[in-house]
Every structure is written in C-alpha cells, then in structure tokens.
Amino acid sequence: MLCGAARLCYRRRVRSRRRGHPLKKPLVIVTRKLPDIVETRMRELFDTRLNPDDKPMTQAQLVEALKTAEVLVPTVTDRLDSRAIVQAGPNLKLIANFGAGVDHIDVETARQRGIAVTNTPGVLTEDTADMTMALILAVPRRMVEGAEVLMNGDFKGWSPTWMLGKRIWGKRLGIVGMGRIGQAVARRAKAFGLQIHYHNRKPVPQAIEQELEATYWESLDQMLARVDIVSINCPHTPATYHLLSARRLKAMKPTAYIVNTARGEVIDENALARMLEAGELAGAGLDVFEHEPAVNPKLLKLKNVVLLPHMGSATLESRIDMGEKVIVNIKTYADGHRPPDRVIPAML
C-alpha cells in the first residue's frame, strides 16, 4: 500500500508522463545528413549523433549504431535486415525511419525484439506524383533526347518529321497501387486527358473512383494488356517483388510505356532492359532501380528511356517535412506514448 504522500507523488509522475513531459533526452543516431533546420531541432531536443559527411555507414558501423542508440534514424540506403537487428543493444527502442518505404527494415524481427518502427507517410505524396507525371510526359515526348540534341550541337532547325514522339492525351494510364501517391498521380493524369485505370488489392472508395473517373481491374494481367502507359506506385514487399515479371511485361502492348517511381524491385529489371532493347516495349521512365545505386548497363545505352537517380521526393520542402515527422515520432516515444506513424508488420 502507498502512503498518501507516495500516492500523490505517483499521480504527479503519471500526469507528467501523460502531458508529454520528456522523461529524458534519448540517444539518437542519424545515419545520413539531413537538412540543417532538421538537424538543429534534433540537437535541441535529443542527445543526437549526426553524420555531417553524409557518407553511408558500412554494415559494421550500422550494427555498432544499433548496439549504441536508443533511437536510430536510418534511410533507404541502410540495410536493417534480421541479421543486423538481432545485434541491437538492449537500449534500442525505436527505429524512426526517414522515409515512407520500410522495405530495407525487417519490421517483424524488430517487433520480436521489442523495437518500434516508424516512417514518414503522406509528406512525399505530391512531390513523388509530380515526378511520376514528369516521366509520363518525358518518355513519350522524347524530352531528354531533345535536350541531348541541343547540348550536342546537333539541332539544325525545325522540320515536320523532326523528333516525333507520341501523344498522351486520350491514352489509357494503368496505375499499379492506388494509395496516396497513386491517387495523386491519377489526379494529375486526368487533368492531362488520360483515361485512368488501376489495379489495387481492393477498389478505392466509390467517391474517389467517381472523382477520378477510374476503372478498377482486379486482374493485373488483364489491365496490363489494355493500357498504354503503366505507372508503378505500390510499395516493395515480398508479395510485390518482381510483380512486373518477364511474363507480365510481355503481356503489355509493344507500343506501351512503363514508369516507376516506387521501388526498383517491383520490376524484373533484366527482363525490362531486354524488352526495351528489342523494341518489345516503347519506352520507360525509371527513378528507381533493382540494385541501387547500380543500374543495368543496357538501360544506360538506350535512347527510349529516361533515367533519374532516385529523386522522386527530392524537394527541400519534402525533406524538411519528413524530418519533422521523424522528430514528432521520436518526441512522442520519449514522452512515453505510442508514435503516430508506427509501422505494423501486418500492414506490409
């Protein structure tokens, strides 16, 4: 039994915890350089160890960080597989990922070890959708080819048959993954006169379908055979690895284009390169690659592709917003509450 003074002291501690008063400054290790404004705020709030040189950690350095930190802030370049996570120290309680995708983290092993995982959803949506739409335009209209002609001094003047591309207005766009980003892509594409088709685990709410005038395809194979442009906007999970397999790529029209701003592993990159080289697909716009930072050498030689170095969400605004979400997740954890963006294995 607690005496009256002890009960009062206990109640005060509980109220303080519920009000969000920090119990302490957790030791936070950040694996990559973040925007200055984000790092400044993190130093104010936490015992923060930064990476000012922005050199990716080796696997040994990453394991050492897991052993030392109470909170680890990794990015997509850090491979936190089960072998790494089982070596985490007893004080590690939170992996606050700087990014929406968590396919580089073994979330289930983290859960088994009592380590929460959070991400930064929502704040990358519009910027990634912008880049997707840019690629949807750039590939059929041969924009990069045209820029190279100018830079190489090969432009000799306009002619009626010069640099002819393909019209996108009125074409069918097939979106694979109709989450936040997929829907944002659909809104942009609809404004450009594209017909919206999509494949998802389940149909989106009817109000969204009506707004986008979108057609749902339960069968991915059937949709791929009928659309003119495919946009990959689904996460990489064990179920979506090589979702666009050689067989499915061959089911597409030879005049079709494919755009990927999601994860490279969703497409069989070798099969895609072979088909583009053989003229079995019209072109591709890729911001992500199966073995980043390596890119299939065949893709680098092709004229009918636009390749970008994983910059779909790369705006200053999105990076600051992502940092703010990381800070909120850490601060909420430090205050003894459930982080708002916690990733549950069943969600993946």
Roles of regions detected by a PLM:
Residues M1-C3, R7-V71, G193, H197, ...:
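N-terminal glycine-/charge-rich "phosphate-binding" loop or analogous flexible N-terminal tail
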Residues R19-G20, K24-P26, R111, T118-M131, ...:
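C-terminal helix-to-coil terminal segments
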Residues T31, G174-V176:
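Conserved N-terminal Rossmann-fold NAD(P)-binding element of oxidoreductases
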Residues T31, T75, F98, N233-H236, ...:
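Short, well-ordered coil/turn residues at beta-beta hairpins
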Residues E70-M151, G165:
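Phosphate/diphosphate ligand-binding glycine-rich loop within oxidoreductases
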Residues L80-A84, R201-K298:
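Rossmann-like adenosine-cofactor binding region
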Residues R113, P121-R172, A184-R187, A191, ...:
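Phosphate-binding beta-alpha-beta segment of Rossmann-like dinucleotide-binding domains, i.e.
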Residues I181:
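Hydrophobic/small residue at the entry helix of a nucleotide-binding pocket
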